[in-house]
Amino acid sequence: MITLAVFVLGYLYCLTQFPGFASTRVICNILTDNAFLGIIAVGMTFVILSGGIDLSVGSVIAFTGVFLAKAIGFWGISPLVAFPLVLMMGCAFGAFMGLLIDALKIPAFIITLAGMFFLRGVSYLVSEESIPINHPVYDTLSGLAWTIPGGGRLSAMGLLMLLVVVAGIFVAHRTRFGNQVYAIGGNATSANLMGISTRSATIRIYMLSTGLATLAGIVFSIYTQAGYALAGVGVELDAIASVVIGGTLLSGGVGTVLGTLFGVAIQGLIQTYINFDGTLSSWWTKIAIGILLFIFIALQRGLTVLWENRQNAAVTRVSGAGSR
C-alpha cells in the first residue's frame, strides 16, 4: 500500500508539472522502456522472498544478447529456434546455481556473484563488440504494438511484461510452489520440518530467476536490436531496488509481485520525469532511487521491530497468565 501511495503521489506531482503525463503514450513508453527490468524483477521477487539474492541476472542479459546475435547473424539459426535454446540454457544455469547453494550451504550472494563474473566473462569471449541483429522476426517483434485509447501504443514487450507479472502473482499466491517460497523465506528450518524439500524448491527458485532473466535478455535484444557484452551492467541492483521499494523484505517471507510492479513503475516514472524536465542529469534517477531505498529499508526495519515487540508482548502475557 505504501508503494502504491508513493507511485500515485509521484504520478500526480509529475502531472502537475507536465500535463503530458496524462497521455497514454507516456504510460506505454514507461512499460516498453522498463519491460526487461519488470520481467527480471518478478524473478528477483521470488528469490528475495525465499531469503536469497541473485546477482547474476545482469550478466544473463548480456550473455543472452551476444549468444542470440552470434546464433542469428553468424550461425544462421532462426530466432524461433534460438529463443527456446537460450531459454533452456538460462534455466539450466539457474538450476545449477540453486543446487550449489543448497548442497554446499554457501550463501546465495557468493554463488550468484561467481555466476555473474562467469557469464560476463563468457559474454566477452563470444564478442567484445556490439553485434547488430538484423532479421525479419526482430523487425516484426520490435514494431508489434496495439493502439489504445488516448493515442498510446502498447508494445508486445510491454504486454509481455504485464503477462509475466500476472503469471508471477498467480504462482506466488495460488500454487504449492509459491507457498513453499514464502515458507522457506519465513523460516527454512520450519519449512523442512513441514516436509518441504528445500533443495528442490531452491533449484526451482533460481531456475525461475535466470529463466526470466533470459527472457528479459531476449526482450532487451529486441529493444536494442543488438547483443553487447556490457549490456545489463547494474541491472541486478535496479531489480533488487524495485523489489525492496515494492515492499518485499530482504530477510524473506513477506512481499508481493504486484508491489514489485509498482517498484518498477516508480523507477520508470522518475526516469520519465527527468527526460521531460530536460535540465536534470540522468544520474538523479540513481540518487532518487537511493533515497527511496533508504526510506523503505527504514520502514521495513521499523515494521519488523514493531511486529517482534508485539509477539514478545503476547508471549509475556500468556506466560504471566499461566504462572498465575
Predicted segments with their positions:
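Short loop segments and helix-boundary regions at transmembrane helix junctions
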Residues: I53, I72-F74, C91-N134, V171-R176, ...
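Cytosolic-side transmembrane-helix boundaries in multi-pass membrane proteins
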Residues: M1-V8, L12, L193-S200, I270-R324
